[in-house]
Regions:
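Conserved N-terminal beta1-alpha1 strand-loop-helix module at the mouth
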Residues: 1-110, 125-128, 135, 141-144, ...
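Short, glycine/charged-rich beta-strand-loop motifs at protein surfaces that mediate ligand recognition
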Residues: 120-124
């Protein structure tokens, strides 16, 4: 079971790891690569000390320079082949079943699917819902990580729908409660 914390603050990353996050994804949007590398070093070091998988959002070059474990790419990011050449864990995003089928052809290590519920992090994007998540999970070969409005009250429902884990943004500071909910659902 995967608990993927998406963070832009080192204190939040530390709280998420202390709460049981298995992956930390550094999401610092619109930074030049050199600045992302500088900002990312403390996150990389924290994850390395904690034995947590470190993923960089959107920037393959920064992921490689930081020695990250992986990179998560959106539909517009590119860099899939470069990520493979660098042996990075590769995560791709999808918001619909159709998008999921298209990106599944790229053979990602995981697929981030959502938003499952409406979320201020992605305003204006229609929610997939649990039925849509279940359909998406059944349609693709890649393991699915549910994202979007996920917290301790609904994380287990994502596993029941077929996801192998969840990603949290706002709930990263409440990772312990999310982790407990996932562990209960796994039994």
């Amino acid at each position: 079971m995967i608990l993927h914390a998406i963070v832009d603050d080192l204190r939040v990353a530390r709280a998420a790891i202390d709460g049981g996050a298995t992956h930390v994804q550094l999401r610092l949007k619109n930074l030049p690569t050199a600045e992302l590398i500088d900002e990312g070093r403390p996150f990389r070091d924290l994850c390395a000390r904690s034995g947590v998988t470190f993923v960089v959002n959107d920037d393959v070059d920064a992921a490689i320079a930081l020695g990250a474990d992986g990179v998560h790419l959106g539909r517009e990011d590119g860099g899939i082949e470069r990520a493979r050449e660098a042996n990075l864990l590769l995560g791709l995003s999808a918001q619909t079943v159709e998008e999921a089928l298209a990106v599944d052809n790229e053979r990602p290590d995981y697929l981030g699917a959502g938003p499952i519920w409406a979320t201020p992090v992605k305003p204006g994007i229609p929610a997939l819902g649990l039925v849509g998540l279940a359909e998406l999970c059944e349609s693709v070969a890649a393991p699915v990580i549910a994202i979007g409005g996920v917290d301790a009250t609904n994380a287990a429902l994502c596993l029941e729908a077929g996801a192998v884990g969840v990603a949290v943004v706002r709930a990263s500071t409440d990772a312990a409660a999310v982790r407990t909910a996932l562990e209960r659902a796994a039994f």
